[in-house]
Amino acid sequence: MTKYEILYIIRPNIDEEAKTALVERFDAILTENGAANLESKDWEKRKLAYEINDFREGIYHIATFEAETTSEALSEFDRLAKINLDILRHMIVKVEA
């Protein structure tokens, strides 16, 4: 299994309840599609380098997990993050051991 890290930026004006539901939903997408050893945590609210969708800051969230390279977890997360309006940007990287 390969170790991956996902960093995504959530819009800053989301209420706490909706943010928790969003994070739980995307964590479930990963685990239901073959990801293991998931660690998910809020990083912090930070100012963005440039404006995204009229927002100047965002809530950074980071998730680390292990998955097979052929796993659906990565592609499904990527697909759903692109169409979710609460996620401003996301990035998936493979962690070198």
Curated annotation (Swiss-Prot):
Keyword Thylakoid in annotation: no
Keyword Cytoplasm: no
GO CC annotations, alphabetized: cytoplasm; ribonucleoprotein complex; ribosome
Disulfide-linked positions: none
Alphabetical list of Gene3D superfamilies matching this protein: 3.30.70.60
Key words, A-Z: Ribonucleoprotein, Ribosomal protein, RNA-binding, rRNA-binding
GO terms classed as biological process: translation
Matches recorded under CDD domains: bS6
GO molecular function: small ribosomal subunit rRNA binding; structural constituent of ribosome
NCBIfam families: S6 (TIGR00166)
PANTHER family per the UniProt record, alphabetical: MITOCHONDRIAL 28S RIBOSOMAL PROTEIN S6, SMALL RIBOSOMAL SUBUNIT PROTEIN BS6M
Function: Binds together with bS18 to 16S ribosomal RNA.
Family statement: Belongs to the bacterial ribosomal protein bS6 family.
Official protein name in the record: Small ribosomal subunit protein bS6
Naturally occurring in which organism (per UniProt): Lactococcus lactis subsp. cremoris (strain MG1363)
Highest classification ranks of the organism: Bacteria, Bacillati, Bacillota, Bacilli, Lactobacillales
Gene label: rpsF
